Amino acid sequence: RGARWQVQPDSIAAIKQTGVFQKLSLNNILGKIEGKNPSEIVIVGAHYDHLGIDPMLDGDQIYNGADDNASGVSAVLQIARAFLATGQQPERTVIFAFWDGEEKGLLGSKAFVQSFPEIKNVKGYLNFDMIGRNNNEAKPAHVVYFYTEAHPAFGDWLKNDIKKYNLNLAPDYRPWDNPVGGSDNGSFAKIGIPIIWYHTDGHPDYHQPSDHADRINWDKVVNITKASFLNMWYMANEKDF
């Protein structure tokens, strides 16, 4: 009887890993400035979740996520403050979004686009994910600027404003015909919403406890925030883009 269960050279076993399902409680945080034409909406967002704590690590066990993505969260907060400081009501409603669950697969932004009753009124989305580091110390002004290729105005805005306001940025312009990957911009691009995404590339501290605030290039964060405020101002007020 025992020989019946022996594995022979011509025996093949197929094992399929189905995974373990876990119920998560996630919370997106949204703020809004009502526009003169509230039937049209633009959104600026960044994910605020990170990796938490790993008690199995020796030494530093806390994943602080200074670049990924406190840098992006700070930009959204400052843009909201700047919109209010103008004292002007934008033409379109502006939503300021802080997404949960990005590190688990864009869960927060996916849930939003699937459940937001006015999603068809969203005309554009601007995303921040990791905007505070140098992947090459010889190029401290480097930033990758992804945008929907069918909307060349997005590229023109940044080029013009860098010259006009003397912003210390050296963008790598990457128009993308289907910008569905990388970060929360993908959730919006997949349903045809035009996007802009600021990103300063990877670095050795990515998803490591060493992603500390003292390694942030603060001048870069400030310049990206200034440029993206202008992006959002145009997105909220220009008739067409």
Where are these regions (language model features)?
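Solvent-exposed loop/turn segments at secondary-structure junctions
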Residues: G2-Q6, G35-P38, Y48-G52, G101-G105, ...
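His/Asp/Glu-rich mid-to-C-terminal helical/loop segments that flank catalytic regions of hydrolases
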Residues: A85, G202-F241
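Sec-exported extracytoplasmic/periplasmic mature domains
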Residues: R1-A3, Q78-Q88, Q114-E118, K159-L167, ...
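Second-shell loop/turn segments in exported
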Residues: A14-V20, L57-N69, A85, F98, ...
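Active-site alpha-helical elements of protease catalytic centers
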Residues: G65-A80
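Metal-dependent peptidase/peptidase-like ectodomains
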Residues: W99-T200
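Short helix-loop-beta-strand segments that form the rim/entrance of peptidase-like active sites
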Residues: G59, A82-G105, K120, F128
